[in-house]
Amino acid sequence: GGIAVSASDTSAISAASAQVNVAVKGGAAGLSVAYLDIDNSILAGSQGATLDSSGGDIAIDARSRSTNLIVIAGVSYGTFGAGAGNAGSSLINNTSVARIDGGSVDAAGNVSVVSDSKDVSTITLGTVSVGAVALGGGVGVDLLGSTSEAWIGGGARVSAGAGGAALSVRDDWNNGWTTDSHKGVVVLATSEVSFTSV
């Protein structure tokens, strides 16, 4: 059989916040705030190790799949004046690394070193203000700065016999990843982020 070294992260945070303010005689104001932060390190690799697979592939795989979801709603009512405000901030700053650092890696099949990051952030804001003078607003901030790395270094010796089935490898982006088949040694880092603020 083959050898697989893998690490993955599927962190998910959801936050919901609501505020209601009512002033029968006078003014009303309300504010809702939510902040989410995911900052993880995902590492799969070998360091100064000897990996030998005489019957298959050697795969080193690091994957990041983080999700932030913020939903905020605010309602304010004041006879004379009303104000409602919402603010949401979503940070995803992961580091995903797949590596062969020194040592020797020999496979009868293929050797793959793959790091893949796909992070999703969604912020939904809503405000309702009712009064003689009414103000409402919302601010959503998405901060996505994840890093994806795949490498071979440290004087490592890597050999792949390219026997058996080919690897399906991401090749290009065209409104979605396209794939291609490859044999031998594959070193690949990919990153995809998606954010929606409403």
List PLM regions with ranges:
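Low-complexity, glycine- and small/polar-enriched segments
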Residues: 1-198
